[in-house]
């Protein structure tokens, strides 16, 4: 477990995370699907935080570095963006990933800590 939240997020502030999150949400709202926009009723989409965390852990196991913005932009809808955002926060809290931002307004880079562990396990050739 991560002892110090400041060590976890470095100079990244909640305001920076919120700005990126808000810009992604705004883009999701501005997307118009020509087929779905004509529907009278949209079905409720069930999205599980646990499932999203599992999906992200699998992704982190095969990708050492990936983009926060890119990850959110690939989500098909607003609910998916929100749940993905929450899953990222949970994975940071549990020490599966870390995040960093080089400069103000730069994209946030996510680093997978389990990718590094899996690579180290693969190099030792353990066959438990």
What are these regions (language model features)?
Residues 1-128:
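Long, charge-dense, low-complexity tracts
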